[in-house]
């Protein structure tokens, strides 16, 4: 990648001619995906991470609201608990009230014009520098805070808070700079030029607990495109989110461009949707919350200066469909990882598995054998842990309720796991359930925990089962088909065309990579704007087309009139 000081010069050249601005796109920004480090015994990255984890042990960080350069504390104090040791308060923070949120809006709006007028390459430099900081000196810090605060293992923190977040910052910068090269044709005696402006107003970014990278991207992508942002981080990802915010500021992000404002959900939603200056909501979270925000925007539509843009990713009930021609080893390995990594707390996690009767004895035996080897525990103390506790008491209670339902339902049988213990942390044993009814609620509703439900279908009913896969739930996020028969793969791909925004063939339903598999789904899963791809940034720009004519216009009358 080019050195940062020369980035702007190498990307764009411009010159003024009269009142018109001419742009010539001279090159593109070359980036690659951030390598995932191994953290093997004795490696520098492992030593650095273990030191960072040791520094966090028993510690609590005080995290204020930040408006501009001012750190603000309110009387509404909250705490973030470590999921695997809820006696450990990892962060103390406060909720912004309505007055502070409105103050943040005003300060952001005052900074908007200058930020929007900065050349794209200058804004990109901020995020490229932040990516370099995350890749190098700040990597261990953000990984450790993600592990301790959100209960991630080493590898899950690495692919999230390091690799994916770095990729978001670098690839978004690449896409944004290259977008400026997308210009309309010019026909003499006129020239045409597109200016990619930020939206008029402020963007509200509402981020989830399960990916540090998503929080950085929800706030960062609109800011890159010239917008000002109010960022409401998740209460249960506060420690890592604040670290990302501080890194952006240290990388050169000016004050008031991203306001860091933890807040109660309803207070934040009510405040931003009642402001005439709201121009967008960038959201990841639950379907009910996104629907509520959408309704609030609709109810206030006459108030806004512009139509707000709503981008949302809302989860899924993701599937693995197995055909009788499938490779069993791939099915077992892919399903265990997809269903149970990070305790099933990924929007893309597999939670329903469809298996042909002919393969079920073999797949069942292998699943149960491998299930017995899964280690659940403290990821900071034991790097051999496969996954840790679920995020908080609310999640624990929700998952436990589903497991109680599984024990009482006549159509469900628990094959393995399902024990729950919240004495130290919010631990749920990975659970495999068999359902005799493909329409059982546990096959339809998102659980967001380490629960996999299997439906065994007759081999000759695979087409009917594919229809079940498509129609059983309201979601459409991710899914996978396992089959070696190419004709079956083609047929399944056609039949499941609308069932998944990210569709996998002989691979697990999780693990999308920025720049390779832009992520998102439709139906109840969201607006499918595909963060991680080149089109996502278009949601956060309002293009202006400028035409300049270089000769006098002449007579107002057309020639045929004379």
Curated annotation (Swiss-Prot):
Provide the protein's localization: Mitochondrion matrix
* Binding of NAD(+), residues: 207, 232, 285-289, 446
Recorded catalytic activity of this chain's protein? L-glutamate 5-semialdehyde + NAD(+) + H2O = L-glutamate + NADH + 2 H(+)
List the EC numbers from the record. 1.2.1.88
Q: Phosphoserine: which positions carry it? A: 43
UniProt superkingdom: Eukaryota
Checking InterPro entries in the record gives: Ald_DH/histidinol_DH, Ald_DH_C, Ald_DH_CS_CYS, Ald_DH_CS_GLU, Ald_DH_N, Aldehyde_DH_dom, P5CDH/ALDH4A1
GO biological process, any: proline catabolic process to glutamate
Role, per record: Irreversible conversion of delta-1-pyrroline-5-carboxylate (P5C), derived either from proline or ornithine, to glutamate. This is a necessary step in the pathway interconnecting the urea and tricarboxylic acid cycles. The preferred substrate is glutamic gamma-semialdehyde, other substrates include succinic, glutaric and adipic semialdehydes.
The entry's protein name is Delta-1-pyrroline-5-carboxylate dehydrogenase, mitochondrial
Q: In which organism is this protein found? A: Mus musculus
Identify the gene encoding this protein. Aldh4a1
